[in-house]
Amino acid sequence: MKEKIGMMLSDVDLEWLKKKYCIKNKGKFLKIGLTGGIGSGKSTISKMFKNMGIDVIDADKIAREVLEKYPPILEYIEENFGEQYIDEFGNLNRREFGNHIFSISKKEREKYENIIIPYIKLEIENQFKLYEKIGKKVCLLDAPLLIEQDMQKDLDFTVLSWVNKETQIKRVGIRDNLSEDEILNRIEAQISLDKKRELVDFIIDNSNTIEETRVQVEKLFQFINCL
């Protein structure tokens, strides 16, 4: 969508959305972006869409796969960050490298991102093309760095899984057993969820119960089905 709605789905009138956008996009292959931040519950929303029959491209999964598919990435890591991040089998020590990459300066982190992100974008585009070729009507890209890496410009509309910062910290602490400093490093390495609210079309408030989240997802699903 050219104009960013930036509204909570709990506040959006479904009939208004249908009248405004359904005719414009009727029959078009839709590329939807879902983003969030660490601990925002984005994966939960992604699974809900998948269970409703929408095909999902998982950018995190692709990020893991490109490490095996494109050897220059691991070579760059070993040469620039140290062999301690590569195990005896030639695989990336993900946790150790993750802790390191989020603790260094933004400039240094961007050097690594400039190596791996083009491969990730290539694989994402290939998957979109495949889904369109086999006749799918809609596909959702689940990508934590959707905004940071400017992927949204190639999508039809974007969705944010939003929670407040306190909820982020609590959820990540329970899930990943990280220190508060490690959690904050990861949160601060991304654009804040409050800033992302201004840059997306729809916002799902994922700070309450699963059922409240599901109601918002189902509303968006109904909207998607009219396109």
Swiss-Prot record:
Q: Which compartments does it reside in?
A: Cytoplasm
Q: Which UniProt keywords apply?
A: ATP-binding, Coenzyme A biosynthesis, Cytoplasm, Kinase, Nucleotide-binding, Transferase
Tell me the residue numbers annotated for binding ATP. G39, S40, G41, K42, S43, T44
What is any one of the record's Gene Ontology cellular component terms?
Answer: cytoplasm
Query: A Pfam family this protein belongs to?
Result: CoaE
Disulphide-bridged cysteine pairs:
none
**Family annotation (Gene3D superfamilies):** P-loop containing nucleotide triphosphate hydrolases
Keyword match Lyase: no
Alphabetical list of CDD domains matching this protein = DPCK
Annotated DPCK domain residues: 31-227
Q: Which residues cross the membrane?
A: none
UniProt GO molecular function: ATP binding; dephospho-CoA kinase activity
**EC number(s) on file:** 2.7.1.24
GO biological process assignments: coenzyme A biosynthetic process
The record's section on NCBIfam families has:
dephospho-CoA kinase (TIGR00152)
Family, per entry: Belongs to the CoaE family.
Question: Per its database record, what is this protein's job?
Answer: Catalyzes the phosphorylation of the 3'-hydroxyl group of dephosphocoenzyme A to form coenzyme A.
Q: What is this protein called?
A: Dephospho-CoA kinase
Q: What is the species listed in this Swiss-Prot or TrEMBL entry?
A: Clostridium tetani (strain Massachusetts / E88)
Primary gene name: coaE
